[in-house]
């Protein structure tokens, strides 16, 4: 008799995706981050749901409702900090997942890569709107500054900003709609993640060597389910340690002050995971130019498959490109640091240099190194 997991309509889908899935036998721990991202999403939706039970999206009570959650709700402090730091671990996994995709040439799975980029944008939008909800100083001014960037769009900019605000400034209408979208977007992200997985299983996973995996595959369970659980333990260790020992390590002290439209904080900055893009935005003196650079810094991922000039999929055997890749990583870390610094010399100059390097490495240096390596293969 055939096992029900292979015949039952629902169990069959789960079986083909997580149990009997043919998986390359040589994939490393860099392939763990997909399942870790799924776990992060589940943690965020669960903790977010409990927070939404006690939160009020009104400018007069939002700040005090967050204080009420932290002080009066049973384990409210833990739920809140798990949610806040869960976002940080989510983005750490996200950046590592994208980095692995770039290094091992996973972007050649075009549909999977395109959906993944949309997932990144949706996650960034969700995180931004979530940051506005506690209605602290940085929430209010962050929302004001970032939404105001849309006013740089010719002709329709000002109308668009007022349409998003629901008035002439960031106020009750803005907070209510941000809460609405922040609540619904994670479920859209979950649906997109399912599509992402669907496209991935059409082609199968890549592997570190960059060669075809067809001749040598093993079932996902028990081999990789056990491996994923190990990664999950590390993730939970980091998240729980962060939540219990230093929950405010990654947050801004200004956000513990109630939003005040009459008092601007000395340094307006987003959460750490947006700092690289914020640094690129600030490095261009022109407003519209800055907004375009900000958009391009993320959307450039969409054109990466067209910039792939190498005859090899992976960077595993391409030493010149490897140097450029790790230079790009260092450049992104530099941009993240610069984004948190004041707009003054020498930070401005470093930020502008790092921004130019970011686009230069991706658009010209990596494709150029690929062409050089192709030539070297012939010698």
UniProtKB/Swiss-Prot annotation:
GO CC annotation terms, alphabetical: mitochondrial inner membrane; respiratory chain complex III
Molecular function GO terms recorded: metal ion binding; ubiquinol-cytochrome-c reductase activity
Binding-site residues, heme b b566: 97, 196
Co-factor requirement: heme b
Binding-site residues for heme b b562, renumbered to this chain: 83, 182
Further remark: Heme 1 (or BL or b562) is low-potential and absorbs at about 562 nm, and heme 2 (or BH or b566) is high-potential and absorbs at about 566 nm.
Protein name, entry field: Cytochrome b
Organism in which the protein naturally occurs: Saguinus midas (Golden-handed tamarin)
Gene designation: MT-CYB
């Amino acid at each position: 008799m055939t096992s029900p997991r292979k015949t039952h309509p629902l169990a069959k889908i789960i079986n083909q995706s997580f149990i009997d899935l043919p998986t390359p036998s040589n994939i490393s721990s860099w392939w763990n981050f997909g399942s870790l991202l799924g776990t992060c999403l589940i943690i965020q939706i669960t903790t977010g749901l409990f927070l939404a039970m006690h939160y009020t999206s009104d400018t007069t009570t939002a700040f005090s409702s967050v204080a009420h959650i932290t002080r009066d709700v049973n384990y409210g402090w833990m739920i809140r900090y798990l949610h806040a730091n869960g976002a940080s671990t989510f983005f750490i996994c996200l950046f590592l997942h994208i980095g692995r995709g770039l290094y091992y040439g996973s972007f050649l799975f075009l549909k999977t890569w395109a959906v993944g980029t949309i997932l990144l944008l949706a996650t960034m939008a969700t995180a931004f709107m979530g940051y506005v909800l506690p209605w602290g100083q940085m929430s209010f001014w962050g929302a004001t500054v970032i939404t105001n960037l849309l006013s740089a769009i010719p002709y329709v900019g000002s109308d668009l900003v007022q349409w998003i605000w629901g008035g002439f400034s960031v106020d009750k209408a803005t907070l209510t709609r941000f809460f609405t979208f922040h609540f619904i977007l994670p479920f859209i992200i979950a649906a997109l993640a399912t599509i992402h997985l669907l496209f991935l299983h059409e082609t199968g996973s890549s592997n570190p060597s960059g060669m075809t995996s067809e001749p040598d595959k093993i079932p996902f369970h028990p081999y990789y389910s056990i491996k994923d659980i190990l990664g999950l333990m590390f993730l939970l260790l980091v998240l729980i340690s962060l939540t219990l020992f230093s929950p405010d390590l990654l947050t801004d002290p200004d956000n513990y002050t109630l939003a005040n439209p009459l008092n601007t904080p000395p340094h307006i900055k987003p959460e750490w995971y947006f700092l690289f893009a914020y640094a690129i935005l600030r490095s261009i003196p022109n407003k519209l130019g800055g907004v375009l650079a900000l958009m391009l810094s993320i959307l450039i991922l969409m054109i990466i498959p067209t910039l792939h000039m190498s005859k090899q999929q992976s960077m595993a055997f391409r030493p010149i490109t490897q140097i450029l890749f790790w230079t790009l990583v260092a450049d992104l870390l530099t941009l993240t640091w610069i984004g948190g610094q004041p707009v003054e010399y020498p930070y401005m100059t470093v930020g502008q240099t790092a921004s130019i390097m970011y686009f230069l490495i991706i658009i010209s240096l990596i494709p150029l190194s690929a062409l050089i390596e192709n030539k070297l293969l012939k010698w």
